[in-house]
A protein has these predicted regions:
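N-terminal leader/signal peptides at the extreme start of proteins
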Residues: 1-16
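Alpha-helical structural signal
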Residues: 16, 29, 45-46
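Internal alpha-helical transmembrane segments of multi-pass membrane proteins, especially GPCRs
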Residues: 16-20, 41
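Residue-level signature of catalytic and energy-coupling elements of molecular machines
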Residues: 26, 55, 158
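A short tyrosine-centered beta-strand micro-motif
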Residues: 36-39
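Membrane-proximal N-terminal amphipathic helix
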Residues: 41-67
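Periplasmic/extracellular, small/polar-rich flexible segments of pilin-like filament-forming proteins
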Residues: 63-161
């Protein structure tokens, strides 16, 4: 009988070893899946920001050329935005652009992202006062401007304070 036992060698993995491997894979998946979901939401929101860049260009040109302010939703860029993730685009009288999000994730659908024209580092432009003087830049994603999207979903280029 002893001879029979000594000739049997272990081949393959034991049940305990397999269970440890399954547990490790489960832990890694629990960490990786939520991180990947956040990444995909940010990637899709980047498309929303790119869709708004047409309005940003149009409004910048109008500010530089001067003339009379066009008014809310009359900046001639609101209807040209084509994206499956943008439900609609609106502008206010000063050129602040807002996009309503759709088709991404229930946690961000129907939320709003804003782009705000600035005349200095932190001062929003006023069409009545700053027309013809050009713009300093744009602020993206600030809650003070109407963005109601959780900041962790915003692309890094759109986390304006």
């Amino acid at each position: 009988m002893k001879k029979l036992r000594s000739s049997m060698t272990q081949r393959g993995f034991t049940l305990v070893e397999l269970m440890v491997v399954v547990a490790i894979i489960g832990i890694l998946a629990a960490i990786a899946v939520p991180a990947y979901q956040d990444y995909t939401v940010r990637a899709k929101l980047s498309e929303v920001i790119i869709a708004l860049s047409a309005c940003r260009t149009t409004i910048t040109e109008i500010y530089q050329s001067g003339g009379s302010p066009p008014g809310a939703n009359n900046w001639q860029c609101e209807s040209g935005v084509l994206s499956s993730y943008v439900a609609g685009v609106t502008t206010d009288p000063d050129g602040r652009v807002s996009a309503t999000i759709q088709g991404i994730n229930p946690s961000v659908n129907d939320k709003v992202v804003t782009l705000t024209p600035l005349i200095s580092d932190s001062t929003p432009a006023s069409a009545a006062l700053n027309m013809g003087s050009g713009l300093y830049g744009w602020r993206c994603g600030a809650a003070a401007d109407g963005t109601n999207l959780p900041p962790q979903y915003l692309p890094s280029s759109c986390r304006g304070g």
